[in-house]
Swiss-Prot record:
Record-level Gene Ontology MF annotations: DNA-binding transcription factor activity, RNA polymerase II-specific; protein domain specific binding; RNA polymerase II cis-regulatory region sequence-specific DNA binding; RNA polymerase II transcription regulatory region sequence-specific DNA binding
Protein name: Protein fork head
Compositionally biased tracts (Gly residues): 20-39
Annotated keywords: Developmental protein, DNA-binding, Nucleus, Phosphoprotein, Transcription, Transcription regulation
InterPro entries, per the entry: FH-like_dFKH, Fork-head_N, Fork_head_dom, FOX_domain-containing, TF_fork_head_CS_1, TF_fork_head_CS_2, WH-like_DNA-bd_sf, WH_DNA-bd_sf
Entry-linked SUPFAM superfamilies: Winged helix' DNA-binding domain (SSF46785)
Organism: Drosophila melanogaster (Fruit fly)
Function: Fkh promotes terminal as opposed to segmental development. In the absence of fkh, this developmental switch does not occur. The nuclear localization of the fkh protein suggest that fkh regulates the transcription of other, subordinate, genes.
Subcellular location: Nucleus
Region (Disordered): 1-62, 175-205, 309-359
Listed PROSITE patterns: FORK_HEAD_1 (PS00657), FORK_HEAD_2 (PS00658), FORK_HEAD_3 (PS50039)
Short name of any one Pfam family annotated for the protein: Forkhead
Gene3D superfamilies, sorted: Winged helix-like DNA-binding domain superfamily/Winged helix DNA-binding domain
Lineage: Eukaryota, Metazoa, Ecdysozoa, Arthropoda, Hexapoda
């Protein structure tokens, strides 16, 4: 190995280190004893033939440490990083085994002290270079963690890799203080601590979860756990908060629910305070007849809701008297209505049968005539208008108006009767019976004025045609005089006004 650094002055500090570490012959163990050598070839120490001032031979390990310190690197940091500084802490090294043991112990102490310092690749490379071997590999230079120089050191030193890793790493982990051991994220202790922390946080959140009890169960629990079996409202609140941490928050919400449960359940009875027990608020206790509402003392499930008979009777009395009287008389009233409807239905069937026997042909003929008249309305529209105007011009205004109004009502009744004959009577009676409890019809009610009658469903033009057709029939009974020009003086406005006047008040255009 060629000379890379200048010769040290005689009064240098590493001389004492070299002299203290030289425990063996220069060929095998003198300079390499401090570095844990003795099992391999000696380091090339013949490049330093000049002895120091006190007679000790300066090994390349000590020289490299000196030169690195003289280059401006901090002494404390290099002593903690460089493994050769371990030889300064051992006063007498007898053999290589003792040197390895002392080196591992001092190395672990120095490395635990240098945990706070930042280690980079150049410092690790300098430590490897100071050992005198060709260990400047990219792997050793690239590693910046604490354990990487220890792992690479076994291949560079004289010991075998297996023995060095077994001795050095076990000594390092064994001699590390507890603080540095817990700082490692991958150590078993940190994993165990995280496993211990997780159940504690889960248990903490589990205690703050909502308990699976109803408000009635909580109130019953509080009352039954009291020796006097009586509690005020504030004492019930306090018992629930002491037992379940969940109810220590959002107090206004669940306390309202507690008050509602006390008021609306018959199993809780309010007892006023006596003079011997002064204080604020009444007592709440369980109803003596409520018994054991929960199965086998388990508050998770209630058997059946308790109802006090006296309170239930009071509730029934507080209901509306009209409603209760209607409910009480509704069965007899319903039977009376049913019998009345059955009687009416029987008579309607008899009347219908007799009507078909006597005048069946006439009704059928009337229906046919009506249908034929509807089919011919479009063709005879002009004639109807002429006849209507003739009727209005020949007679006074109020007479045909009154006469036509009476005839229109008669026509509506006939039409409704014909529709009733065509429909099944049971359907009509069922319809009226179903509508009877809901709506009471006025006294002058006729089926023709129903909103769903045929007159309401017909368009406005068809209704006007029917009216004019009826007027033309009545106009035929007058003197059959020819058409005059008097209807021209009447005008179209009076015609539409007469139609609007004749229209019944209930008709609406769809």
């Amino acid at each position: 190995m060629q000379k890379l650094y200048a010769e040290p002055p005689p009064s240098s500090a590493p001389v004492s280190m070299a002299s203290s570490g030289g425990g063996g012959p220069p060929s095998g163990g003198g300079g390499g004893g401090g570095g844990g050598g003795g099992g391999g070839p000696p380091p090339p120490s013949n490049n330093n033939p000049n002895p120091t001032s006190n007679g000790g031979s300066m090994s390349p390990l000590a020289r490299s440490a000196y030169t690195m310190n003289s280059m401006g690197l901090p002494v404390g940091g290099m002593s903690s990083v460089s493994p050769q500084a371990a030889a300064t802490f051992s006063s007498s090294v007898l053999d290589s085994a003792a040197a390895v043991a002392s080196m591992s112990a001092s190395m672990s102490a120095s490395m635990s002290a240098s945990m706070n310092a930042s280690m980079n690749g150049s410092m690790g490379a300098a430590a490897m270079n100071s050992m005198g071997g060709n260990c400047m590999t990219p792997s050793s230079m690239s590693y910046a963690s604490m354990g990487s120089p220890l792992g690479n050191m076994g291949g560079c030193m004289a010991m075998s890799a297996a023995s060095m890793s077994a001795a050095g790493l076990s000594g390092t982990y064994g001699a590390m203080p507890p603080g540095s051991r817990e700082m490692e994220t991958g150590s078993p202790n940190s994993l165990g601590r995280s496993r211990v922390d997780k159940p504690t946080t889960y248990r903490r959140s589990y205690t703050h979860a909502k308990p699976p009890y109803s408000y009635i169960s909580l109130i019953t629990m509080a009352i039954q756990n009291n020796p006097t079996r009586m509690l005020t409202l504030s004492e019930i609140y306090q018992f629930i908060m002491d037992l379940f941490p969940f109810y220590r928050q959002n107090q206004q919400r669940w306390q309202n629910s507690i008050r509602h449960s006390l008021s609306f359940n018959d199993c809780f009875v309010k007892i006023p305070r006596t003079p011997d027990k002064p204080g604020k608020g009444s007592f709440w206790t369980l109803h003596p007849d409520s018994g054991n509402m929960f199965e086998n003392g388990c508050y998770l499930r209630r058997q059946k809701r308790f109802k006090d008979e006296k309170k239930e009777a009071i509730r029934q009395l507080h209901k509306s008297p009209s409603h209760s009287s209607l409910e009480a008389t509704s069965p007899g009233k319903k039977d009376h209505e049913d019998s009345h409807h059955m009687h009416h239905h029987h008579h309607s069937r008899l009347d219908h049968h007799q009507h078909h026997k006597e005048a069946g042909g006439a009704s059928i003929a009337g229906v046919n005539v009506l249908s034929a008249a509807h089919s011919k309305d479009a063709e005879a529209l002009a004639m109807l208008h002429a006849n209507a105007e003739l009727c209005l011009s020949q007679q006074p205004q109020h007479v045909p108006t009154h006469h036509h109004h009476q005839h229109h009502q008669l026509q509506q009744e006939e039409l409704s009767a014909m529709m009733a004959n065509r429909c099944h009577p049971s359907l009509i009676t069922d319809y009226h019976s179903s509508m009877h409890p809901l709506k009471q019809e006025p006294s002058g009610y006729t089926p023709s004025s129903h909103p769903f009658s045929i007159n309401r469903l017909l368009p406005t033009e068809s209704k006007a045609d029917i009216k004019m057709y009826d007027m033309s029939q009545y106009a035929g009974y007058n003197a059959l005089s020819p058409l005059t020009n008097s209807h021209a003086a009447l005008g179209q406005d009076s015609y539409y006004q007469s139609l609007g006047y004749h229209a019944p008040a209930g008709t609406t255009s769809l």
